[in-house]
From Swiss-Prot:
SUBUNIT field: NDH-1 is composed of 14 different subunits. Subunits NuoB, C, D, E, F, and G constitute the peripheral sector of the complex.
Any Gene Ontology CC annotation: plasma membrane
InterPro entries with a match to the protein in the record: NADH_DH_suC (IPR010218), NADH_quin_OxRdtase_su_C/D-like (IPR037232), NADH_UbQ_OxRdtase_30kDa_su (IPR001268), NADH_UbQ_OxRdtase_CS (IPR020396)
Record function comment: NDH-1 shuttles electrons from NADH, via FMN and iron-sulfur (Fe-S) centers, to quinones in the respiratory chain. The immediate electron acceptor for the enzyme in this species is believed to be ubiquinone. Couples the redox reaction to proton translocation (for every two electrons transferred, four hydrogen ions are translocated across the cytoplasmic membrane), and thus conserves the redox energy in a proton gradient.
Keyword Transport on entry: yes
Source organism superkingdom: Bacteria
Pfam families reported in the protein's UniProt record: Complex1_30kDa
Catalytic activity, reaction form: a quinone + NADH + 5 H(+)(in) = a quinol + NAD(+) + 4 H(+)(out)
Name of this protein: NADH-quinone oxidoreductase subunit C
Gene this chain is encoded by: nuoC
Protein localization: Cell inner membrane
EC number(s) reported in the record: 7.1.1.-
């Protein structure tokens, strides 16, 4: 299988007109890297080229690397049913650099792009309806970013007295704790019942 993927990777690199920056085959999966400027043209090539035939979109997701200048990776997964092959396409972007929407090519990308925007804040230009999908309408921030607080900003609950959902500041029942991983629970010296069997 990896030999067929190597052949496909060479075909994409040689025939896409420089749209693919690099390609790797690892663990039986082909990954192609591109740029924000080339994503639309590369996806069009992958769909329309007879050798590729990636006509099904499986997923679009985001990854946050806060230490990078372009902190977000947008990862696309496609399927070519005739060839029974999958491909992963990656690109890097920043908070203020939008990615062209591929909804005109794959209408099924609509909700995937909305999810990536909702959870990571990756903007998609040309998207028909870029609004929140999983979080509430008034939600502030993007919860899968590494710098988003674990507790969030507000607590949402249903109040039975007013018969509606209410938003309140987060109230923790106990303080955050700094855990000492060199605690006395690690590496105990006392003997437990049954330990004498292991010593023999």
């Amino acid at each position: 299988m990896s030999e067929a993927l190597q052949v496909l990777a060479s075909h994409i690199t040689e025939n896409s007109g420089g749209l693919a920056l690099s390609s790797t085959v690892a663990f039986g999966e082909l990954t192609v890297t591109t740029t924000v400027e080339n994503i639309y043209a590369l996806v069009t090539f992958l769909r329309d080229d007879a050798r590729c035939g990636f006509i099904n979109i499986i997923d679009i997701c985001g990854v946050d690397y806060p230490e990078r200048v372009e902190r977000f990776e947008v990862v696309y997964h496609f399927l070519a049913p005739k060839q029974n092959q999958r491909i992963r396409v990656k690109l890097s972007t920043s908070e203020d650099k939008p990615v062209p929407s591929i909804c005109p090519l794959f209408p099924g990308a609509d909700w995937f792009e909305r999810e990536a925007w909702d959870l990571y804040g990756v903007m998609f230009t040309g998207h028909p309806d870029l609004r929140r999908l999983l979080t509430d309408y008034g939600f502030e921030g993007h919860p899968l970013r590494k710098d988003f607080p674990l507790t969030g900003f507000v607590e949402v609950r249903y109040d039975d007295t007013v018969k509606r959902v209410v938003y309140e500041p987060v109230e923790l029942k106990q303080e955050f704790r700094s855990f000492d991983f060199l605690s006395p629970w690690e590496g105990t010296d006392y003997v437990l019942p049954g330990d004498e069997k292991a010593a023999k």
